[in-house]
C-alpha cells in the first residue's frame, strides 16, 4: 500500500482520507504533495526532459520555455467522451452525454483500479479565482501526469497557500485524473502516455470530476473547462451566479471613463485576440486591458451590478494564427516561461507555427517530432501555449481583485458569412437571452455562394454547460429579473446585451470587415450606447448603428462596405428564426416559454417590418 505521508501544511482530515482512498484504488508507486514552489516546478520539468516528454527550447530566444509533443491520438478535447452523470437524465439534457452515475462509477472503478501503478500521484491544490475571494472556489486534482502538475501552476493559483485557505474543513472540488497507462516493474515509459479509451466524467450533485486516458489540456487540466464551466455552472445555478465561456476586457476612453465588457464567442472566433485588442490609428488615448480571455465567473453585487472574475491565472491559447500583427500583446506575453504543446521547432530550438511568419523556416521539426514536409501542417491546428496571465502587457490592474469588476455589457458573436449584421443591440434582457441562446457559428469556411453549416452554440456554452441547456436559459432569465430589481433600487441597471459578427463575406467569399484592432470602432459604439450617448436605428432584429454613428478616423472603410456587412435580408432572417425551432424542439418541454414567445414575436416583426 502506498504511504500517504501528508505534509504538515495539509491540515484537512477529509482531504487526507480521500487521497488515501484514491491511492488504494489507483495504486501509485508514490505520492507527492505539490507545494507550487519554483524548485518543484523546475524539478518536474527536468524529470520530463529526462523522460523525453519535454524538450528545452533556445533559452536565449525563449527563456524558461519548453516544448511538449503529445501522442498524435491525444490532441484536443473529446466531446463525445465527456459525460454529465446527473442522477436524473433530464437534468443533463439533450445537449450533453449522460450515463447513469451508478453504472459510470462501476465502469470507472474498473478503469482506475491500478491505473497509476509504477507512477507518482501528484496532489495538486488549486484555487479558481484569487485566493480567498468570495467568488473563488478550491479544487484538488490527483494526477499521475507531471505535465498536468506544472501546467496547473500556470493556469490556476496552485500551491501551499491554497491549504491555508482550505484550513481543516474547507470545501473543495475533488478531481481525479489518470493517463490510464500503468507501468509494470521494469517497463520503459513512453514520452506521452495515454490510453485509447477516454472518459471525462462530471458528477454534478457530488461536485466530482474523473478523467481517464488523456493527458491533453482541457481533458486533463481539470480546473479549466471541467470545474470552471461544467461544475461551476451547476453551482452557479444553485447559488444565483453565472459561470460563462467569456473573455473580460476593460475599456478606458481618453476622458478616463472605464467600462468592463464580457464577451462570448465559440472557439476559433477570436476571443483571445479581442481580449488583448490594441486600439487602431484614430484611437489615441484609448486603452484596452485584459482581465481574462476564456472564462468568467459573474456574481450579483449588493448594488445590483454584476461583478466578474477570471477564475484562471493563465492563458491556454491556440498558437496557430497568432503573430505580431493579429495579436501583439499575446506575442509579448510569450516572451518567457511558456509551456508549448504540439508546435513545430526550428533546428536552433525556436518555436514555429502556421501564421507566425509567411516563410516556413528551413529544417523544421513538426509537432510529431519528424522533419517537416511542405504542404503538411508543421504545428497541430490545436497547438497550444500555457503561460501566466500576469506576463500579459495589457493585463488589467484589477484582474485579481477579489471583488471582481463590474460588467457594463455582454457581447455574443459567432462566425456567419451572411444574415447577422456587424453589431446589434438587443431590445431588452429577454431579447438578449434569446439571441445568445440561438447564436450560431459556421463550422466550415463558407465557399463562394455556399453557406457553411451553422452549428447552434448557445452562449458559446454547448460543450460546457454542466446541466440541461433549457434550464440554463431559464437561469439567465431569472437572474436578470432578480438583479434588475436590485439594480433599480440602487440606481443601476442591467448590462446591455449586444451581438456582433466580424465574419460577413462579399459575393466573392472574402471577409469585408478588417477585424482585429478595428473591432475597437464597434466597441466604442457599444460603450456609448451603455452611456446613452450614441445613436441607433431600430430594426426588427435590434438597434443597429448607421455608418455615421461609428468613428472612422484613421481608416478608409467606405459606406458601401459598411452596408454590405449591416444590411438585413428579410428572407434570410425568416429562414434564420425558423431554424431556431430545431434547437428548441431538441430541448423539449423545459424550454422557457418566454423564449418561444420571443421567437414568435421576432418572426412576426421580421415578416412585417422589412
Curated annotation (Swiss-Prot):
Binds 1 Mn(2+) ion per subunit. CDD domains: PEPCK_GTP (cd00819). Mn(2+) binds at residues 225, 245, 294. Coiled coil: none annotated. It catalyses: oxaloacetate + GTP = phosphoenolpyruvate + GDP + CO2. Pathway: Carbohydrate biosynthesis; gluconeogenesis. One of its GO terms (cellular component) is cytosol. Its main location: cytoplasm. GO terms for molecular function: GTP binding; manganese ion binding; phosphoenolpyruvate carboxykinase (GTP) activity. GO terms for biological process: cellular response to glucose stimulus; gluconeogenesis; glycerol biosynthetic process from pyruvate; oxaloacetate metabolic process; propionate catabolic process; response to lipid; response to starvation. Its cofactor is Mn(2+). The active site is at 269. It comes from the Bacteria. The keyword Protein transport does not apply. PROSITE patterns: PEPCK_GTP (PS00505). The keyword Metal-binding applies. Keywords: Cytoplasm, Decarboxylase, Gluconeogenesis, GTP-binding, Lyase, Manganese, Metal-binding, Nucleotide-binding. GTP binds at residues 268-273, 384, 415, 516-519. Pfam families: PEPCK_GTP, PEPCK_N. PANTHER family: PHOSPHOENOLPYRUVATE CARBOXYKINASE (PTHR11561), PHOSPHOENOLPYRUVATE CARBOXYKINASE [GTP]-RELATED (PTHR11561:SF0). Catalyzes the conversion of oxaloacetate (OAA) to phosphoenolpyruvate (PEP), the rate-limiting step in the metabolic pathway that produces glucose from lactate and other precursors derived from the citric acid cycle. Belongs to the phosphoenolpyruvate carboxykinase [GTP] family. Monomer. This is Phosphoenolpyruvate carboxykinase [GTP]. It comes from Acinetobacter baumannii (strain SDF).
Amino acid at each position: 500500500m502506498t504511504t500517504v505521508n501528508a505534509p504538515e501544511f495539509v491540515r484537512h482530515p477529509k482531504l487526507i482520507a480521500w487521497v488515501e482512498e484514491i491511492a488504494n484504488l489507483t495504486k501509485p508507486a508514490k505520492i507527492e504533495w505539490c507545494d507550487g514552489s519554483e524548485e518543484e516546478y523546475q524539478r518536474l520539468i527536468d524529470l520530463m526532459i529526462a523522460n523525453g516528454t519535454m524538450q528545452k527550447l533556445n533559452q536565449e530566444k525563449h527563456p524558461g520555455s519548453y516544448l511538449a509533443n503529445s501522442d498524435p491520438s491525444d490532441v484536443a478535447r473529446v466531446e463525445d467522451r465527456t459525460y454529465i452523470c446527473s442522477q436524473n437524465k433530464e437534468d443533463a439534457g439533450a445537449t450533453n452525454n449522460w450515463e447513469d452515475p451508478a453504472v459510470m462509477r462501476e465502469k470507472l472503478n474498473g478503469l482506475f483500479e491500478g491505473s497509476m501503478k509504477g507512477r507518482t500521484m501528484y496532489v495538486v491544490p488549486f484555487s479558481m479565482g484569487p485566493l480567498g475571494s468570495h467568488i473563488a472556489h478550491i479544487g484538488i486534482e490527483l494526477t499521475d501526469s507531471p505535465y498536468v502538475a506544472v501546467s496547473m501552476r500556470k493556469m490556476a493559483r496552485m500551491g501551499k497557500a491554497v491549504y491555508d485557505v482550505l484550513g481543516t474543513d474547507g470545501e473543495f472540488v475533488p478531481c481525479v485524473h489518470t493517463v490510464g497507462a500503468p507501468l509494470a516493474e521494469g517497463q520503459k515509459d513512453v514520452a506521452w502516455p495515454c490510453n485509447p479509451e477516454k472518459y471525462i466524467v462530471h458528477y454534478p450533485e457530488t461536485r466530482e470530476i474523473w478523467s481517464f486516458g488523456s493527458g491533453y489540456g482541457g481533458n486533463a487540466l481539470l480546473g479549466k473547462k471541467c470545474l470552471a464551466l461544467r461544475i461551476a455552472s451547476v453551482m452557479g445555478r444553485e447559488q444565483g451566479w453565472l459561470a460563462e465561456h467569456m473573455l473580460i476586457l476593460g475599456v478606458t476612453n481618453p476622458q478616463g471613463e472605464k467600462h468592463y465588457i464580457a464577451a462570448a464567442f465559440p472557439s476559433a472566433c477570436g476571443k483571445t485576440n479581442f481580449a488583448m485588442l490594441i486600439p487602431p490609428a484614430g484611437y489615441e488615448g484609448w486603452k484596452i486591458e485584459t482581465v481574462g480571455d476564456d472564462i468568467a465567473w459573474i456574481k450579483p453585487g449588493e448594488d445590483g451590478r454584476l461583478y466578474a472574475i477570471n477564475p484562471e491565472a493563465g492563458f491556454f491559447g491556440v498558437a496557430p494564427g497568432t503573430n505580431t500583427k493579429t495579436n501583439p500583446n499575446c506575442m509579448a506575453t510569450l516572451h518567457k516561461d511558456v509551456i508549448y504543446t504540439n508546435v513545430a521547432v526550428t533546428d536552433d530550438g525556436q518555436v514555429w507555427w502556421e501564421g507566425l511568419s509567411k516563410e516556413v523556416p528551413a529544417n523544421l521539426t513538426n509537432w510529431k517530432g519528424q522533419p517537416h514536409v511542405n504542404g503538411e501542417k508543421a504545428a497541430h491546428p490545436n497547438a497550444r501555449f500555457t503561460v501566466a496571465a500576469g506576463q500579459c502587457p495589457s493585463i488589467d490592474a484589477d484582474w485579481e481583485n477579489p471583488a471582481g469588476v463590474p460588467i457594463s455589457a455582454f457581447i455574443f458573436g459567432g462566425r456567419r458569412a451572411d444574415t447577422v449584421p456587424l453589431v446589434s443591440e438587443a431590445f431588452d434582457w429577454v431579447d438578449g437571452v434569446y439571441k445568445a441562446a440561438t447564436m450560431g457559428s459556421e463550422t466550415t469556411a463558407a465557399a463562394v455562394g455556399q453557406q457553411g453549416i451553422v452549428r447552434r452554440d448557445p452562449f458559446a456554452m454547448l460543450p460546457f454547460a454542466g446541466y440541461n441547456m433549457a434550464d440554463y436559459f431559464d437561469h439567465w432569465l431569472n437572474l436578470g429579473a432578480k438583479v434588475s430589481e436590485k439594480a433599480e433600487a440602487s440606481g443601476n441597471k442591467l448590462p446591455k446585451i449586444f451581438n456582433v459578427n466580424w465574419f460577413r463575406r462579399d459575393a466573392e467569399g472574402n471577409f469585408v470587415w478588417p477585424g482585429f484592432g478595428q473591432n475597437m470602432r464597434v466597441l466604442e459604439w457599444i460603450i456609448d450606447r451603455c452611456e446613452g450617448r450614441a445613436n441607433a436605428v431600430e430594426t426588427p432584429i435590434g438597434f443597429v448603428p448607421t455608418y455615421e454613428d461609428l468613428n472612422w478616423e484613421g481608416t478608409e472603410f467606405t459606406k458601401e462596405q459598411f452596408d454590405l456587412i449591416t444590411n438585413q435580408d428579410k428572407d434570410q432572417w425568416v429562414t434564420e428564426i425558423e431554424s431556431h425551432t430545431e434547437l428548441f424542439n431538441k430541448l423539449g418541454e423545459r424550454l422557457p416559454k418566454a423564449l418561444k414567445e420571443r421567437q414568435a414575436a421576432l418572426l412576426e416583426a421580421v415578416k412585417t417590418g422589412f
